[in-house]
A protein has these predicted regions:
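Glycine-rich phosphate/diphosphate-binding loop of Rossmann-like nucleotide-binding domains
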Residues: 1, 119-158, 166-170
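Phosphate/nucleotide-donor binding subsite
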Residues: 1-25
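Cap/lid and interdomain-hinge subdomains that line or gate substrate/regulatory clefts
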Residues: 2-4, 67-128, 256, 263
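Gly/Ser/Thr-rich loops at beta-strand to alpha-helix junctions
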Residues: 30, 34-43, 64-65, 126-136, ...
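Short, acidic/small-residue loops that bind anionic groups at enzyme active sites
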Residues: 31-34, 43-73, 81-83, 150-156, ...
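Short Gly/Thr/Asp-enriched flexible loops that form oxyanion-binding sites at enzyme active sites
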Residues: 38-53, 137-141, 290
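Acidic, glycine-rich loop-and-beta core segments that form the ion-binding/anion-interacting portion
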Residues: 145-198
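C-terminal non-catalytic interaction/assembly regions of soluble proteins
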Residues: 191-294
């Protein structure tokens, strides 16, 4: 594959990532705008990944239509994505208007100065799902804020957990509460919330004080259509919304998920605690509710 288009794209991604990182370190750029189709957008992501959180980034793309996965365009950065509407082949009455809007947006972003913070507040990263929100909002967040910490929550949907890990690797947090680890179930058994293979390892590897719980680790998140497949007929189900259904894991699947936790946590060289909730792993895992399976 050395001479293939894909190999060339990978080489270009490596080069542009390194070059943009160098330009930013030299204070030669304050933002980034990219225009492209499928390959161009993938290359652009490598450039945007080289810039820190908060630096303006805009991708104008033919595949930003909702029909394609957005992970190729954004990944774990904070880029703004704009649909080009038409394919990109020179300037015409439509592309001119779209490009002008994109230029106006990036210029405006660069000109807006960040608000000056009165003092530096240490941040705690927390993974969260709809099925684990209540204890975070009612108990954990207020208690941490009372102690002077800023609380940053990440939706553990296959992207949010990875975003939290990325920021942990960059030293963004004073501590991490990995409260919603459903992505480990997905990494083993599929569904909508599959994350990177290294999920949950960044804070541990960087010796950031970490507390881990198996919040929602006993469910698999599926599309409503997939949840109705015959292989899931014997599973307990909870229709979370019109697009998403939660199903319970089996005893054997839970053993595999537990082994994944053990493998990752055993790498710890810093301060790590594992808390086991004795009365259920998520909001529907309670006696009398849809996913109760003691």
């Amino acid at each position: 594959d050395a001479g293939s288009r894909g190999a060339a794209v990978e080489k270009m991604r490596d080069c542009i990532h390194a070059y943009v990182k160098k330009l930013f370190a030299e204070k030669k750029i304050q933002g980034l705008i990219a225009v492209g189709g499928a390959e161009g957008s993938v290359i652009a992501r490598a450039a945007m990944d080289a810039l820190p959180l908060g630096v303006p980034k805009i991708a104008v793309s033919t595949i930003a239509s909702g029909k394609h996965l957005f992970s190729d365009l954004i990944g774990y950065n904070d880029a703004t994505v704009m649909h080009s509407v038409i394919d990109i082949l020179g300037i015409n009455s439509i592309s001119r208007r779209v490009f002008n809007n994109a230029v106006g947006a990036i210029v405006g972003m660069v000109k807006v100065k960040p608000e000056a913070s009165e003092k530096k507040i240490e941040s705690i990263g927390i993974s969260m799902l709809g099925t684990t929100t209540k204890p975070i909002m009612s108990v954990i967040k207020p208690e941490l804020e009372k102690r002077g910490y800023e609380v940053l929550t990440f939706h553990a949907n296959g992207t949010g957990g990875d975003c939290m890990d990325t920021l942990a690797a960059e030293g963004y947090f004073a501590g991490v509460l990995d409260f919603s680890t459903n992505e480990l179930a997905a990494n083993n058994f599929g569904g909508l919330h599959v994350a990177k293979a290294g999920r949950m390892e960044a804070a541990i590897e960087n010796k950031i004080p970490t507390v881990v719980t198996p919040g929602a680790a006993n469910i698999i998140v599926l599309s409503r259509e997939e949840a109705l497949l015959p292989k899931y007929d014997d599973r307990q189900k909870y229709f979370h919304n019109p697009n998403i259904t939660l199903i319970n894991t089996t005893r054997e699947e839970l053993k595999t998920i537990a082994a994944t936790f053990a493998e990752k946590l055993n790498k710890a060289k810093g301060k790590v605690k594992f808390l086991y909730p004795a009365k259920g792993f998520c909001s529907q895992d309670k006696e009398g509710l849809a996913l109760w399976n003691p």
